[in-house]
């Protein structure tokens, strides 16, 4: 909806000073120059998942695997950074993840008059069989909004960020672990405990934990894991893709995950 608004209504009425678009394309296209700063905020779901496919084939049923219903993804419509357009692609992220699920579920339960009134989209599809994505794209979104506000106020565009790598069929290129290559990399991708993906389980993405032997080989102690996450978090702060306060939430998460090292 906001993509269509910014691309059509904004051109004529010029009501807004900038746009933050956290969505896939509309009719296979993104937003071009509309005279104000536009920041496209993209997860794997918009690149190689259900939101990349709205014109690649109709999604008939959101409760069964996407791959059984639709054609391969379309070419990404966002293009290179240019003029008043910036694109942030968050590797490993999904459109709707664990942190957002916790927030929206609490809100929906509070507002619902009965359990039956809680929206079904808050339930991960049963076919998935994996936990919800844990990347925490909302933490990166906070930095993106910060940069957009500065851009609107000062006229200085934020630096370009690396894009997620795609093959000739517009599929995400993955490393030996199954993690997306390129893109903005949060601590769960730079210091992983498992595979976060945004192209599975419709909007929710997925998280598949590494074997405990693999985790201990990567991080022999809890402190070594905390150190790896802290280094990744501070690197993201330096790159401008996390605010310091949001970066420290990843460190707190790492400090709380001590169970892997019990008895070590």
Task: Annotate each PLM feature.
Residues 1-264:
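C-terminal His-loop and adjacent cap/lid subdomain of alpha/beta-hydrolase
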